[in-house]
Design a protein with these regions (language model features):
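Non-catalytic signal-transmission and effector/linker regions of two-component phosphorelay proteins
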Residues: 1-5, 10-28
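Extreme N-terminal, non-catalytic leader segments
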Residues: 16-17, 147-211
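Short beta-strand/loop segments at the ligand-binding rim of alpha/beta enzyme cores
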Residues: 27, 105-115, 306-313, 328
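The Walker A (P-loop) glycine that initiates the GxxxxGKT/S ATP-binding motif of P-loop NTPases
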Residues: 34, 217, 248
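Cofactor-cradling patches in redox/metallo enzymes
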Residues: 37, 44-54, 58-150
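ATP-binding Walker
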Residues: 38, 218-221
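Nucleotide-state-sensitive switch-loop elements of NTP-binding domains
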Residues: 189-210, 221, 226, 230-325
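Hydrophobic anchor at the beta1->P-loop junction of P-loop NTPases
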Residues: 213-215
Length: 328
């Protein structure tokens, strides 16, 4: 009689050694989501939690997200990677279109990762990776590697410094280009934007009288819901002729350095910016112990210079420190 503990061909293969976790050298940002018509979000929720614990700033969109929503988030948030789970059977079309749209928006550098358990068969995985998807993980990968090693691969592959690729000039930003605005904000966050460009931004912003609205409050008080409703009403009342910029700040975790940038998931009034959308939305991690990140004044100036008629700054909820937004 065989020993029931003896492995068989059907026995899952477990990772034998714990991987050495890759701690990001640069700020790594990811958009995570479950694909359109897909309500299976348990796996992507697990992945985004592990990403966050490993020091990644995660913009989580939740489930049932279209390619345009994912791409617009990737462009405006200036991320290095996108991670999507797809269990609904349309993965071939979805991932190909995702790669195509990123390239069309000037974000071909964004690496796309995905998974769909046994729904995505090996031949489809090979075809999608040949098309431009960085990696589709299979059930066998999960058995052999384990979740930490899988996430490790994502983090290591995307640990690149986007501030090394700043625009040579601000012409595109001053014309309202969201892709350039996103990269300029990345440069400001890193303290890498050249001083002459900062001076140009500040001068361009000073020429325009743009109101800045700060939204703050305790956790769960409805800050993001209020922001979304304000966006919706401004868009309706002004027939999308008003350009709005939203800067949403969330705290960085003290342990691990990651952050869940969860305000965008509550926004229902955003439209893809390449299809007439009048809203630029950027999530920021504090990266310090303060409620308002360093460089916020120049980030607001950049949105004004890019044509924003109204700037909304939403702070994290951390006791009385919320009042710090008044100074900006």
């Amino acid at each position: 009689m065989s020993d029931p503990r003896t492995p068989t061909p059907d026995t899952p293969v477990e990772a034998t050694t714990a991987p050495t976790l890759h701690r990001p050298v640069h700020p790594v940002r990811f958009v995570t989501a479950a694909s359109l018509f897909d309500g299976h979000d348990a796996s992507i929720n697990i992945m985004r939690r592990i990403l966050q614990s490993q020091g990644v700033e995660v913009i989580h969109l939740g489930h049932n997200r279209s390619v345009d929503e994912v791409v617009d988030a990737a462009v405006q948030e200036d991320v290095q990677g996108v991670a999507v789970s797809s269990y609904q059977g349309g993965h071939n079309e979805y991932f190909r279109y995702l790669v195509d749209r990123l390239r069309a928006r000037g974000a071909g550098h964004v690496q796309v990762f995905g998974g769909g358990c046994g729904v995505i068969i090996p031949s489809e995985i090979a075809a999608l990776q040949a098309y431009g998807v960085a990696r589709i993980f299979s059930p066998q990968d999960g058995q052999a590697l384990g979740l930490p090693a899988m996430v490790n691969e994502l983090v290591a592959a995307c640990d690149v410094d986007l501030a090394d690729h700043l625009p040579a000039d601000l012409d595109a930003l001053l014309s309202g280009d969201h892709t350039t605005l996103a990269r300029v904000i990345t440069g400001i966050e890193a303290g890498r934007l050249p001083e002459h460009q900062l001076a140009e931004l500040r001068a361009a912003a000073a020429r325009r009288r743009v109101p800045v609205l700060g939204i703050t409050g305790t956790g769960g008080s409805g800050k993001s819901s209020l922001t979304d409703e304000l966006i919706r009403r401004f868009r309706l009342d002004h027939e999308d002729k008003l350009s709005i910029a939203v800067i949403a700040v969330d705290p960085t975790r003290r342990r691990g350095g990651g952050a869940l940038l969860g305000d965008r998931i509550r926004m229902n009034a955003l439209d893809p910016s390449d299809r007439g959308g009048a809203v630029y939305f950027r999530s920021l991690a504090t990266r310090t112990a303060t409620t308002v990140p360093p460089g916020i004044d120049d980030i607001v100036a950049a949105t004004k210079a890019a044509g924003a008629d109204l700037v909304i700054v939403e702070t994290p909820a951390i006791d009385q420190g919320d009042a710090a937004v008044v100074d900006h």
